[in-house]
């Protein structure tokens, strides 16, 4: 039985592990944390867990057929989203032909992380926790590296990236319904959001490439309280790791002698930074690459077909004059109700694999 090492027990790493175990491999997943979704050592959140909702457009049936994994038990339908865009508010109901879902991230039994972990264990995957890999040279060739936003893999493997900075607040709520609130405002050329699912709630304000001043956090905090009635007792300044959005050439399936998966591979939307869909898809492709580099590379390039277009759009968005940016954003959200049925899945064509699996 051939052995396979996977570094990182995130979504892509566990999807790869499940698929390889089903193919007869003896799979070991090495994870730096003490458990799946466990205590983190990232700057600003040392010794705490990240328990928050993560939203994504996704066709569950297609994803299940593609990856061999049905995540519907932990995917909560999201019907609408409140958007505060440069001083204007729009509540958007998602077009039914392009469904959106929230998944919980973290160590609780209701999270997608724990769900995939339990599936992996059922397939015979072994996990080695509190096992930080710093010497990648010691890993066997074709090891799968799926270390996500956080970790030491970016520089040793030569993957272009931008550091991400921001503020994060987390807590619990008695409200049963899932909820997402989005803010686009002049204080960041990225965005801020609030999400709640399975009673876990969190808010995040971030910026790629440069830190945000504390007064920016205070402004977002005030907006949430006044506009949405949402408050948190504690906000933490956080170094959020890195994103694969430094160059239009970021997506890569291989680095040195290794196979990349998830965020590290660049399989994500470079504009809105949706990551769940790409993580699941790239985990499957990484598993394919273990036995067939060429076929996996062709599939990787196919699902990431629109990354360059998305990168250029994100670059332009970052550089636009504020007045023009406001009008572009308002136009897009106002016209979503008729554009979405017209464009259907093309609305999210920059999302890796969306409408292509």
State the predicted function of each range:
Residues 19, 38-85, 165:
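N-terminal FAD cofactor-binding segment of flavoenzymes
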Residues 29-33, 263:
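Conserved acidic E/D residue at the C-terminus of a beta-strand in Rossmann-like folds
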Residues 76, 212-291, 295:
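FAD/FMN-dependent oxidoreductases across multiple families
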Residues 110, 114-232, 266:
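Predominantly flavin-linked oxidoreductase catalytic cores and closely associated redox partners
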Residues 288-327:
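Active-site-proximal substrate-binding core of FAD-dependent oxidoreductases
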Residues 316-357:
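C-terminal auxiliary extensions adjacent to catalytic cores
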């Amino acid at each position: 039985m051939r052995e396979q090492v996977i570094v990182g027990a995130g979504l892509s790493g566990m999807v790869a592990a499940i698929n390889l175990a089903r193919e007869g491999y003896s799979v070991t997943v090495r994870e730096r944390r003490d458990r799946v979704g466990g205590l983190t050592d990232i700057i600003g959140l040392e010794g705490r867990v990240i328990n928050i909702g993560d939203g994504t457009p996704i066709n569950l049936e297609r994803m299940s057929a593609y990856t061999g994994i049905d995540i519907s038990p932990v995917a909560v339908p999201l019907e609408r989203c409140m958007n505060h865009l440069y001083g204007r508010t729009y509540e958007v109901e998602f077009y039914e032909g392009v469904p959106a879902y929230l998944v919980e991230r973290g160590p609780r039994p209701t999270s997608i992380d724990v769900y995939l972990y339990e599936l992996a264990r059922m397939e015979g995957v072994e996990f080695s926790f509190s096992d930080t890999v710093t010497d990648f040279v010691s890993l066997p060739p074709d090891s799968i590296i799926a270390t996500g936003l956080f970790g030491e893999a970016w520089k040793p493997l030569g993957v272009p990236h931008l550091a991400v900075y921001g503020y994060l607040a987390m807590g619990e709520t008695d409200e049963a319904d899932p909820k997402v609130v989005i803010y686009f405002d002049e204080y960041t050329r990225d965005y801020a959001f609030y999400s709640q699912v399975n009673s876990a709630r969190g808010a995040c304000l971030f910026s790629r490439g440069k830190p945000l001043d504390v007064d920016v956090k205070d402004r977002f905090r005030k907006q949430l309280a006044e506009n949405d009635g949402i408050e948190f007792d504690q906000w933490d300044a956080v170094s959020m790791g890195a994103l694969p959005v430094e160059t239009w050439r970021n997506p890569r399936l291989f680095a040195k002698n290794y196979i990349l998966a998830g965020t590290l591979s660049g399989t994500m939307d470079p504009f809105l930074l949706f990551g769940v869909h790409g993580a699941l898809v790239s985990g499957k492709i990484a598993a394919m690459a273990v036995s067939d580099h060429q076929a996996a590379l062709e599939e990787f390039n196919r699902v990431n077909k629109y990354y360059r277009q998305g990168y250029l759009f994100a670059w332009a968005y970052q550089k636009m004059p504020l007045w023009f940016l406001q009008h572009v954003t308002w136009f897009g959200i106002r016209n979503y109700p008729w554009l979405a049925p017209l464009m259907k899945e093309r609305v999210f064509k920059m999302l890796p694999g969306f409408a292509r699996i």
